């Protein structure tokens, strides 16, 4: 995979489509959190399906500059989208790539599912797929207790992931407000035709009822699985690709 940097801050891996198409179709991948970046196999899978694939790191996470959650992570994804019509220069040898996005799709899982859903509000985004997404941060305190006994989740992240996330207590607390980076706060603005979600009833971290409730309020499509736990986005994309491809092509 190639590497580039957007807005002088956001590092992204990317792949051009394995086979050229008449129109450039772009997929932006939104990572979960916390976790090590590992969507390279998914990027390769999607590239072979004919898409440009961009896999950015949020500001303040991993290779990117900045402070994590200083801004809503979905804005980082949209900042990447802003830059694409200008072309992309890979960092190792300076090779330049030109593209003119005809259709843009956003895929995210868990924490990144919220980013994907919020990106659907941008008119440039054609469709989004959100896998086991966090749709309402009211679940946060209960979810934290399942991951750590540390009373400060941000402190746990700093200790466990080092500089992988430059996360302050103050920025993490913004999620508790219900207004910051929260799809539920903007559900009335959603276009249900642009959103497809996947979730398992036995997900231990994101309660399925919260996602089902969001789907009912927004009208978004939800494929609810009986089992699967906290579903891996790569698995979902490969297992349900024919269905997802039809959704993209509507």
Where do the PLM segments sit?
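Short beta-strand/loop motif that positions the catalytic acidic residue
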Residues: 190-191, 196-199, 203
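N-terminal cap/lid segment of alpha/beta-hydrolase-fold proteins
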Residues: 1-22
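Catalytic histidine-centered segment of alpha/beta-hydrolase-like enzymes
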Residues: 228-241
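Hydrolase active-site cap/lid region
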Residues: 118, 122-169
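Alpha/beta-hydrolase active-site loop
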Residues: 68-98
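Short beta-strand element of the alpha/beta-hydrolase
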Residues: 23-32
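Conserved alpha/beta-hydrolase "acid-adjacent" motif
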Residues: 204-210
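Conserved alpha/beta-hydrolase
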Residues: 46-65
């Amino acid at each position: 995979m190639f590497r580039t940097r957007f807005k002088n801050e956001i590092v992204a891996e990317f792949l051009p489509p394995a086979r050229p198409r008449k129109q450039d179709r772009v997929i932006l991948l939104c990572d979960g959190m916390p976790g090590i970046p590992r969507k390279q196999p998914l990027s390769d899978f999607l590239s072979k399906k004919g898409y440009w694939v961009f896999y950015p790191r949020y500001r303040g996470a991993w290779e990117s500059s900045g402070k994590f959650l200083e801004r809503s992570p979905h804005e980082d994804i949209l900042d990447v989208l802003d830059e694409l019509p200008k072309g992309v220069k890979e960092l190792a040898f300076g090779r330049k790539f030109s593209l003119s996005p005809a259709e843009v799709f956003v895929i995210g899982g868990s924490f990144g599912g919220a980013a994907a859903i919020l990106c659907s509000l941008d008119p440039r985004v054609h469709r989004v797929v959100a896998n086991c997404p966090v749709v309402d941060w009211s679940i946060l305190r209960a979810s934290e207790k399942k991951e750590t006994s540390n009373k400060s989740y941000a402190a746990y992240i700093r200790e466990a992931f080092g500089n992988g996330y430059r996360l302050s207590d103050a920025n993490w607390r913004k999620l508790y407000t219900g207004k910051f980076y929260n799809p539920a706060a903007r559900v009335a603005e959603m276009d249900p035709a642009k959103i497809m979600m996947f979730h398992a009833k036995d997900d231990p971290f994101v309660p399925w009822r919260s996602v089902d409730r969001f789907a009912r309020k927004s009208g978004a499509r939800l494929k609810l699985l009986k089992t699967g736990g906290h579903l891996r986005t790569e698995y979902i994309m490969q297992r349900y690709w024919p269905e997802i491809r039809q959704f993209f092509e509507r």
